[in-house]
């Protein structure tokens, strides 16, 4: 009996030590994480570290379409691309709230795709649990989304890092690329013509409330917000871009829709796939977008 108690106590002590070591290691890496091309790296930089005059936000389309190096060179303004694939508007609401705690950008560019405005099919925070307790806005969002049992589990460092500890460790081993400022260029050319969908679009009510909150945050801090719909080969006649045009018009938000721009959708060779520009396409698009940045900053002044 004493042996059983001893082994149980030893196992518990080992588990506790492992939990503490994993937690301390994870937090140390995250707090000093270099800029790499991993999604987690972009999240860490956006939530904790970066400041800039221009902030680009959006899902993978934004991540691959806006090159901050060109914006910085042409405007003289610092710029960071905080795009991340596979997340909803909730995530970008957190990004704006966190960024505005550190600095007041002159301009926030929010590229919105239809998937950002849809209800999540699974746990949208599953790959961000390692950041629980480190970011106030993110922690509050998780506490609101999760059950008491799940919140109890999140007190464990092993549980929080279970899915992504390998990715956390890779932050130290991956090639550092701070000069890209969050941008992720894509190589390769697509050769399939564009498609047109007539399916009507309707946003999820919760995601819409997150977008409304972003608009409110920007206005309360006197930050210029611009909404875009970057080039794509998936065109719509009653889709997200048409809905955004009405939404932005009602709220007097500048909106720039590039989905029906012939210089892009008639040239699939500028794309890596049907929704993402390749590096050459992103170069052309970012150069074109410079005039939008300058016009909105001049209008603000």
Features from the language model and the residues they span:
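Structural motif
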Residues: 53-54, 107, 226
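Short hydrophobic beta-strand that contains or immediately precedes a catalytic carboxylate
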Residues: 54-58, 277
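Hydrophobic membrane-insertion alpha-helices, especially the h-region
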Residues: 6-24
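Membrane-embedded segments
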Residues: 57, 61-143
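Secreted/periplasmic serine-hydrolase-like ester/acetyl group-modifying domain
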Residues: 125-223
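Acidic-and-aromatic substrate-binding clefts and catalytic sites of carbohydrate-active enzymes
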Residues: 86-90, 202-207, 233-240
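C-terminal regions of proteins
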Residues: 242-298
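Alpha-helical transmembrane signal-anchor/signal-peptide segments
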Residues: 26-45
């Amino acid at each position: 009996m004493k042996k059983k108690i001893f082994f149980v106590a030893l196992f518990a002590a080992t588990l506790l030590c492992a939990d503490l070591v994993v937690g301390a290691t994870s937090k140390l890496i995250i707090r000093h994480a270099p800029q790499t091309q991993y999604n987690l790296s972009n999240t860490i930089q956006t939530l904790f570290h970066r400041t800039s005059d221009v902030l680009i936000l959006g899902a993978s389309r934004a991540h691959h379409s806006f090159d901050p190096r060109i914006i910085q060179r042409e405007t003289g303004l610092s710029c960071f691309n905080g795009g991340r694939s596979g997340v909803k508007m909730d995530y970008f609401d957190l990004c704006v709230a966190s960024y505005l705690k550190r600095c007041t950008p002159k301009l926030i560019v929010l590229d919105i795709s239809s998937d950002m405005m849809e209800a999540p099919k699974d746990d949208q925070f599953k790959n961000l649990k390692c950041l629980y307790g480190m970011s106030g806005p993110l922690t509050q969002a998780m506490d609101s989304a999760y059950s008491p049992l799940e919140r109890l589990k999140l007190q464990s460092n092993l549980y929080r890092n279970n899915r992504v500890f390998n990715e956390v460790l890779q932050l130290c081993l991956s090639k550092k690329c701070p000069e890209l400022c969050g941008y992720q260029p894509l190589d390769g050319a697509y050769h399939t013509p564009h498609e047109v969908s007539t399916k009507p679009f309707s946003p999820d009510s919760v995601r819409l409330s997150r977008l409304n909150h972003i608009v409110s945050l920007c206005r309360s801090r006197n930050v210029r917000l611009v909404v875009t719909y970057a080039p794509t080969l998936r065109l719509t006649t009653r889709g997200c871009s048409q809905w955004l045009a009405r939404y932005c018009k009602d709220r007097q938000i500048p909106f720039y829709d590039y989905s029906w721009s012939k210089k892009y959708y008639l040239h699939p060779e500028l794309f890596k796939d049907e929704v993402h520009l390749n590096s050459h396409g992103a170069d052309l698009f970012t150069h074109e977008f410079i005039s939008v940045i300058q016009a909105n900053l001049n209008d603000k002044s």
